[in-house]
Amino acid sequence: MAIDFRHWPSKVANILVYVTLLSGNLYSTFGGDQDQDSPYDSKHQSYITPASFTFYIWTLIHFLLGGMVVYQWFTDKVYEAVGWHFVMASLFNALWLGLWSSGQTFLAFIALFFATGAVSFIYYRLKDQDNAETLLDVIFLHLPFSLYHAWIFVLLITNLFAIISPIRSGGPSTFQVVFAIAGLAFIASTVIGYIEYKQGDVAGALVLAWYLFGVFDQQEQDAIHWTALGLGIAVAAYTLKPFVFRLVGRQTGETAPLLG
């Protein structure tokens, strides 16, 4: 494949913001001032905050996005789907990291809201306008944004809960338990959209299951703990639906699984 220099300003910008996003996440996870707060091992937690190991999904997302910023030089599909929205998403994501680390949690949530909007624009444009014609399209265009979209949605909800229903030293109130279970149920229910919309998105759905198992591991309150496990199992099982349909011969174009 020949290198495609069309839209090079956007492609160069994608590389720069990718490096910024990667550096910010690495710094928040492994470096920095111990007095600063990290979204991945945060002082600001709620009763739907998952275990810290779940945040290592960023490693896979960053690896795939790194492939995307290389792949963009060999096909115009990346620019057609992503445009300048990856730049916007990365800048708002970096702003979120900085604001959260400095304790500006509400402003951090606003920044994350705009980052989620930019990622969602890319995600739905890919679903509506572009079919994955090659394995490289799947791995370095569809898959990274499937994972990114599901994960940033989870982060948005968990950050909101950390602001409005934080952990209490005396344990959760009854309202907080019910509120947490409702939040988990809402997140789990979005698996229907991931599996049923367009061609189906197994990768995005599995991110939700991964998150719910992380909550199961982290939260000790019985109702929240076991609800997270039950919902995680249910979500993981629901992701098998497209494969079951294929196995029994009921597969249609609307339910064909697409990893990304």
Tell me the role of every PLM-derived stretch:
Residues 250-260:
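Non-transmembrane, juxtamembrane loop and terminal tail segments
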Residues 63-109, 113-135:
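Internal transmembrane alpha-helix with an interfacial aromatic "cap," most often the third helix
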Residues 18-35:
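Alpha-helical transmembrane segments of multi-pass membrane proteins
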Residues 5, 49-54, 171-189, 213-240, ...:
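Membrane-interface transmembrane-helix boundary segments in multi-pass integral membrane proteins
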Residues 43-57, 138-145, 169-172:
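Short aromatic-rich membrane-water interface segments that cap or initiate transmembrane helices
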Residues 16-23, 85-97, 111-123, 141-159, ...:
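Alpha-helical transmembrane segments of multi-pass integral membrane proteins
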Residues 2-15, 58:
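N-terminal membrane topogenic signal
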Residues 97-110, 167-172, 193-198, 219-222:
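Membrane-interface helix caps and helix-loop-helix hairpins in membrane proteins
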